[in-house]
């Protein structure tokens, strides 16, 4: 079946690459201009554990060129009892046990492979998340908040089989990565044949029809349980304002968690987020447990990167200052002017830009850190933000993982100064943050990285969706306002969950030939919901 389909990577090319590449991609490009990223995900990944879908909508409007589907991941690196542990097949020669960040860096070095021209931006790598509480491995913090969800502080999939959807071309590049553990000719040929077999399986899956996913939906007000009442959250804000007045911090970013009982499929929440809240970082990730089943799912629509590393260039985009979008272009322009003229918002933004410069200064070559495009407004689907860009060149001997940990966690989710703000957060929040305020993204084997801050994100496990949101508290903050602001930020995901629960498939009961329309009454259950 399909064995006659040529791979872009020939056996001879593969043999040559295997001489000095530990990870060798074998690719096949197919025309798939009738597929959407979601239909391709359903066909290729089928909602299985250890699969993912990563997309991007620039400024909440036009979709970016690429969507990435994680089809297969034989291994995942996570943490158990404070030690690094591999789930699934342990990669040959990969370290295990000990400090998880050291094991991750050693794995990236073990699999380090120079970028190859012509490949999509993500072709293999470690894809997953760092929870906010990973910071406890970087800084000494008190342990006061209840660790009720018991989430791992880190889990990264070793993504070997990836599909890259090119929206500009209407093509999908299927990628089966062969990990070259043993450079003998026999082993290299075996690795190539195995990669071709996986490409054939992916190609066949893409060619299969799917049941219709056409559905109606509505947008009801979301249900939720809040951790705090408006009075309780107001008391937290008042306490932090007092701490700021006493000189303990300039800004602190408290939050609270919201919960919803739901049995809705995470992919349907993702579908609704694509409709209602498209953002620069969209992600669906089914996180495996030790048995190989899905332990929990992550669904998110984040507007904000923590850090990106591309060809040695490190970039972070501090975001601070928000206005809701207007109904018209004229309203948007007025709101932009108001935001840029707001002295309080500008002061907060400058503080976070300085924090970003300091973070990058820890890992970049001295003299290369620059602030570019300072304090401009970017519009998203529902809000507009004040944004700046801070860049630098990665220092000698520094890695993409160093850049991630230097910036972690985001100042926009902790405060300034960062460590003291996190200590104050630990004193006032009821439960550990878990995923909220951490990051979702990837480190590839060519030394690049791209991580989004885990906000506007749901963690779905055992019939409950957890959504967390907060906001920056400064000297003149108001408790009731901050409560409403945090609730509004959570609504984007809570609304998507509520809408997903109303999805009703339209089952017409008759398979129609392409281009043929059913006659009146031909389908016995036409229109039945």
Curated annotation (Swiss-Prot):
Coiled coil: none annotated. Keywords: Amino-acid biosynthesis, Aromatic amino acid biosynthesis, Lyase, Magnesium, Metal-binding, Tryptophan biosynthesis. This is Anthranilate synthase component 1. Binds 1 Mg(2+) ion per subunit. Feedback inhibited by tryptophan. The keyword Amino-acid biosynthesis applies. Chorismate binds at residues 321-322, 436, 456, 470-472. It comes from Mycobacterium leprae (strain TN). Mg(2+) binds at residues 348, 485. Belongs to the anthranilate synthase component I family. InterPro entries: ADC_synthase (IPR005801), Anth_synth_I-like (IPR019999), Anth_synth_I_N (IPR006805), Anth_synth_I_PabB (IPR005256), Chorismate_C (IPR015890). Part of a heterotetrameric complex that catalyzes the two-step biosynthesis of anthranilate, an intermediate in the biosynthesis of L-tryptophan. In the first step, the glutamine-binding beta subunit (TrpG) of anthranilate synthase (AS) provides the glutamine amidotransferase activity which generates ammonia as a substrate that, along with chorismate, is used in the second step, catalyzed by the large alpha subunit of AS (TrpE) to produce anthranilate. In the absence of TrpG, TrpE can synthesize anthranilate directly from chorismate and high concentrations of ammonia.
């Amino acid at each position: 079946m399909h064995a006659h389909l040529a791979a872009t990577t020939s056996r001879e090319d593969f043999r040559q690459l295997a001489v000095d590449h530990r990870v060798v991609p074998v690719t096949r490009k197919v025309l798939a201009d009738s597929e959407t990223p979601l239909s391709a995900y359903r066909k290729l990944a089928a909602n299985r554990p250890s699969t993912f879908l990563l997309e991007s909508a620039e400024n909440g409007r036009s979709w970016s060129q690429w969507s990435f589907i994680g089809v297969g991941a034989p291994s995942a690196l996570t943490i158990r009892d404070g030690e690094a542990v591999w789930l699934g097949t342990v990669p040959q020669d990969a370290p295990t046990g000990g400090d998880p960040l050291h094991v991750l860096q050693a794995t990236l070095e073990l699999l380090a492979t120079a970028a190859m021209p012509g490949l999509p931006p993500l072709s293999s790598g470690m894809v997953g998340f760092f929870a906010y509480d990973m910071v406890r491995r970087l800084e000494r913090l008190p342990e006061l908040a209840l660790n009720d969800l018991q989430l791992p502080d880190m889990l990264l999939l070793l993504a070997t089989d990836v599909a890259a959807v090119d929206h500009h071309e209407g093509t999908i590049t299927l990628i089966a990565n062969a990990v070259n553990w043993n450079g003998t000719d026999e082993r290299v040929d075996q690795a190539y044949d195995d990669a071709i077999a996986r490409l054939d399986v992916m190609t066949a899956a893409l060619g299969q029809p799917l049941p219709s996913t056409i559905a109606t939906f509505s947008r009801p007000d979301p249900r939720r349980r809040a951790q705090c009442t408006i009075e309780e959250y107001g008391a937290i804000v008042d306490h932090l304002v007092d701490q700021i007045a006493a000189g303990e911090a300039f800004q602190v970013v408290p939050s609270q968690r919201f919960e919803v009982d739901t049995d809705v499929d995470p992919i349907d929440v993702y579908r609704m987020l694509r409709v209602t809240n498209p953002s620069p970082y969209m992600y669906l990730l089914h996180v495996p447990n030790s048995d190989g089943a899905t332990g929990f799912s992550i669904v998110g629509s984040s507007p904000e990167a923590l850090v990106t590393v591309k060809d040695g260039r490190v970039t972070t985009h501090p975001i601070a200052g928000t206005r809701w979008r207007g109904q018209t272009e004229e309203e948007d322009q007025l709101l932009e002017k108001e935001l840029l003229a707001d002295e309080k918002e500008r002061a907060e933004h400058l503080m976070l830009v300085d924090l970003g410069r300091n973070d990058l200064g820890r890992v970049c070559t001295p003299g290369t850190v620059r602030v570019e495009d300072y304090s401009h407004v970017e519009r998203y689907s529902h809000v507009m933000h004040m944004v700046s860009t801070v860049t630098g060149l990665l220092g000698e001997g520094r890695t993409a993982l160093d850049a991630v940990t230097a910036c972690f966690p985001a100042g926009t989710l902790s405060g300034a100064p960062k460590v003291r703000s996190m200590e104050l957060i630990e004193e006032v929040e009821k439960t550990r943050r878990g995923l909220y305020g951490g990051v979702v993204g990837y480190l590839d084997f060519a030394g690049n990285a791209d991580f989004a801050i885990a906000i506007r994100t749901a963690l779905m496990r055992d019939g409950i969706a957890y959504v967390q949101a907060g906001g920056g508290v400064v000297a003149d903050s108001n408790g009731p306002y901050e409560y409403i602001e945090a609730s509004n930020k959570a609504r984007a995901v809570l609304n998507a969950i509520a809408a997903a629960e109303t999805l009703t498939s339209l089952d017409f009961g008759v398979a129609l030939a392409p281009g043929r329309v059913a006659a009146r009454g031909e389908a016995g259950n036409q229109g039945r919901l």
